[in-house]
């Protein structure tokens, strides 16, 4: 089966240790364990972040927001404002909350 994308980049708030942030790290870890190229880009995008110590158990790669044709950029519902910055990549919105927006 041919992959329909080159890389999945999941946007996550930097320095955030919450249930939603942990879910993003778990998801990225599981995709990588299945040999699917996925990474996390922390925002604000102008800052540099490290993976929080609490999430060091997850195998995740960090990347920049790579707005390329073959990429998918997944945004949490609280960061849909970044959709306007993405011109080329495909966009997916992951609704991590039950009733928050």
Short names for language-model regions:
Residues 1-72:
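N-terminal pre-catalytic "stem/leader" segment of glycosyltransferase-like enzymes
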């Amino acid at each position: 089966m041919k992959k329909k994308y080159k890389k999945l980049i999941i946007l996550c708030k930097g320095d955030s240790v919450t249930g939603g942030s942990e879910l993003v790290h778990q998801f990225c870890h599981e995709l990588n364990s299945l040999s699917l190229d996925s990474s996390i880009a922390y925002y604000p995008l102008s800052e540099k972040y490290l993976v929080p110590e609490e999430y060091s158990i997850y195998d995740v790669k960090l990347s920049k927001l790579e707005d390329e044709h073959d990429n998918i950029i997944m945004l949490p519902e609280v960061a849909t404002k970044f959709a306007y910055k993405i011109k080329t990549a495909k966009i997916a919105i992951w609704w991590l909350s039950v009733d928050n927006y």
